[in-house]
Amino acid sequence: KNILHVGVFKKNDERTIYNMVYKDGKTGTAYIKRFASGGVTRDKEYDLTKGTKGSKILYFTANPNGEAEVINVALKPMSKLRKLTFDQDFAEIGIKGRGSQGNILTKYAIKKITLKSKGVSTLAGRKIWYDPIVKRLNENGHGRYLGEFQAEDKILCVFNDGSYELS
């Protein structure tokens, strides 16, 4: 019930970065954090919040290439609040461990969080090699080094028969 994310876990995947906003059950303070999940144990539950009763995840995304989006946070109207909406860029938040508390986003009650814009990767490019023996591209360092590629980069492969392929 109430599943936020389902995905295939890749061992030693350091590029998948999770962005999250949660409300602490005890204080009501909203925290923002970015984290990578290096390893997991099967059939074990991990608490991504502080662990206090009543804590709730308000926003969650999984980014396979470390993208950092910009969110718009709308606060519930209160008498002393002047600014009811503000933007927060996940690129300004450091990538920490899964068990970290995170940074304080706001101490006020949040009405809703919406995605303003999808960001670009905050990680370095992937290093790609071509292995002529198996005729494949790889990230393991086997074969001839082609270069470092970003998420939006494409590789043009031209074959002997004149055909080509973008990958």
Q: Where is each model-derived feature located?
A:
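C-terminal interaction appendages of subunits in large macromolecular complexes
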Residues: 1-167
